[in-house]
A protein has these predicted regions:
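Single conserved hydrophobic/aromatic residue that forms the stacking wall/gate
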Residues: 1-20
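Transmembrane alpha-helix boundary signature
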Residues: 8, 12-14, 49-61, 76-91, ...
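Residues within membrane-spanning alpha-helices of integral membrane proteins
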Residues: 15, 41-44, 66-69, 73-76, ...
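Central hydrophobic cores of alpha-helical transmembrane segments in multi-pass inner-membrane proteins
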Residues: 21-22, 39-54, 125-129
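Short aromatic-rich membrane-water interface segments that cap or initiate transmembrane helices
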Residues: 21-35, 97-117
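Hydrophobic alpha-helical transmembrane segments in multi-pass integral membrane proteins
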Residues: 30-51, 64-69
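Membrane-interfacial loop-to-helix junctions in multi-pass inner-membrane proteins
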Residues: 49-73, 134-154
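Conserved, charged catalytic cores of large soluble enzymes
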Residues: 85, 89-91, 96, 121-143
């Protein structure tokens, strides 16, 4: 949306030629394809920050990152084959259907990413729980490692 090239199907179908940059940015997650792309981006960021800041029990860290990576891989396959946001437009839309009016409000435009931070944040908690079950070591140390990530997601 920011490049102003006007060739993507998402852009043309929404008719975003004359809206502000803020609204163009919120138009990225204004449809299914963009929402899935945002979901993957947040998954990758949580995976990165977890691997960066989690220093206790390396085996938990490795298993958690592996489970997160499997989720990233699955969502990436889904987005590439079934819901591609980078698909070039085959239609010549004159003006499109426009941006969802709800996303034109500044606070409601940031609502989906903030909501996704919580949803996707709990995927890290899920991955850590799977790692704990695999290692059969769910104890106080496990809980102390996962506690800040639960608070971040919440």
């Amino acid at each position: 949306f920011q490049a102003e090239d006007g060739i993507r199907d998402v852009e043309r179908s929404r008719g975003l030629g004359d809206v502000y940059k803020r609204q163009k940015l919120s138009g990225v997650w204004g449809n299914h394809e963009g929402s899935m792309l945002l979901w993957i981006l947040i998954l990758v960021l949580f995976n990165f920050f977890f691997s960066l800041f989690s220093l206790k029990r390396k085996i938990f860290q490795n298993l958690t990152v592996s489970v997160q990576s499997l989720m990233i891989f699955g969502f990436t396959l889904f987005i590439l084959f079934l819901s591609n946001p980078f698909k070039l437009s085959e239609n010549n839309y004159a003006d499109g259907i426009g941006l969802n009016p709800i996303l034109q409000d500044p606070l409601l435009a940031i609502h989906p990413p903030v909501l996704y931070l919580g949803y996707v944040g709990f995927s890290l908690v899920f991955s850590f729980a799977i790692a704990g079950l695999i290692c059969k070591e769910i104890d106080k140390t496990w809980a102390s490692i996962i506690k800040p990530w639960v608070f971040i997601a919440w």
